Amino acid sequence: MYHQVLDKPDKLGKYVISPRELEEDLRLLDSLGYETVTVRDLIDFCDGKRKLPQKPIMLTFDDGYQTDYINVFPLLRQYNMRAVFSVVGSYTEKYSQENIDKHINYAHLSWDEIREMYESGLCEFQNHSYNLHSLERRHGCLKINGESNEQNRLRTLS
């Protein structure tokens, strides 16, 4: 699983790798005979609708950074490999707006970029939640201590 692929040495670390490092990974996987699969491929395999390659591997990218379009997508095309991107809905909405600052360190994919990547046949998109790890308010449908059934129903369905 990858997070951000960024060509900024001062930002590299646990969750950020360089395009060169990603290309090394892709080259190695290719040389060892691995074939990329998607979540759809795996579901179809489990449903008995398809076979998996001899050496399947799933490349996943979390959060949907714009660097997926800038740095990852060209490498996927170059190596003819597929990947799964889990995007955060609220970030995609935000960065699809006109006149928004798209700084390479933190910008996320727009709907147009997602569409282009998806239409290539190399990229599958999944949901990584709407607000990511937002702790601003409680989520879920379990009752809060002291909450009536009616209060819970109104809170969770509104």
Spans of model-derived segments:
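Metal-dependent polysaccharide deacetylase catalytic core of the NodB/CE4 family, i.e.
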Residues: V5-L6, K55-I57, R77-S158
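C-terminal domain-boundary segment and adjacent tail
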Residues: I17-K51
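Short, solvent-exposed loop/turn elements at domain surfaces
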Residues: D7-L12
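Membrane-embedded segments
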Residues: Q54, T60, D68-N71
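Extracytoplasmic/secreted proteins, especially bacterial periplasmic and envelope-associated proteins
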Residues: E21-E24, D41, T67, N71, ...
